[in-house]
């Protein structure tokens, strides 16, 4: 919702992904222009940018999908000098398929407690120019994060971190 509020009246492309957040294609959000498969949102936004550089491109991906297939898209977007904002919806679980652990949860598939892999550090290591984490329920902070992210000349990322509602 913060992205839609911040970008009101501007030319945008919203690239979706497979996950609970695919429901963002329905009203009242109505903000999924594309939805193909896990991880395709980031690479599709990159393609949009290179074909329509006056359009600000956003990709929406969950934390679990980011670890499964989003990292490669981020690396390619940085390498190919795309201007886009990667929105990671981090609820610290794999909610859509049964709350399985992933590298960001700090729990292995065998239930062993290990150090979490930091999404922020992964994005920074890949060369993302701006990485911020916000609470999506703090609308003022979230809208400002979007406004700041679109000013970045290159790949920016916003991690919207909140618990799963399921």
Sequence positions of predicted segments:
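Cofactor-pocket helix-loop regions in the catalytic cores of large enzyme subunits
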Residues: 1-26, 68
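Thiamine diphosphate
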Residues: 25-157
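Cys/His-rich short segments
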Residues: 163-166
């Amino acid at each position: 919702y913060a992205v839609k509020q911040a970008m009101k009246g501007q030319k945008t492309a919203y690239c979706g992904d497979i996950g609970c957040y695919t429901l963002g294609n329905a009203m009242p959000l109505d903000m999924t222009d594309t939805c193909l498969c896990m991880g395709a949102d980031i690479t599709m936004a990159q393609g949009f940018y290179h074909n329509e550089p006056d359009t600000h491109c956003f990709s929406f991906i969950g934390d679990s999908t980011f670890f499964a297939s989003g990292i490669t898209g981020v690396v390619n977007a940085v390498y190919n000098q795309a201007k886009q904002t990667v929105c990671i919806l981090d609820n610290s679980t794999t909610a859509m398929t049964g709350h399985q652990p992933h590298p960001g949860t700090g729990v292995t598939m065998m239930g062993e407690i290990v150090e979490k892999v930091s999404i922020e550090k992964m994005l920074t290591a890949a060369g993302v120019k701006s990485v911020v984490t916000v609470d999506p329920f703090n609308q003022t902070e979230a809208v400002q994060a979007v406004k700041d992210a679109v000013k970045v000349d290159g790949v920016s990322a916003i991690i919207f971190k909140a618990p799963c509602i399921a």
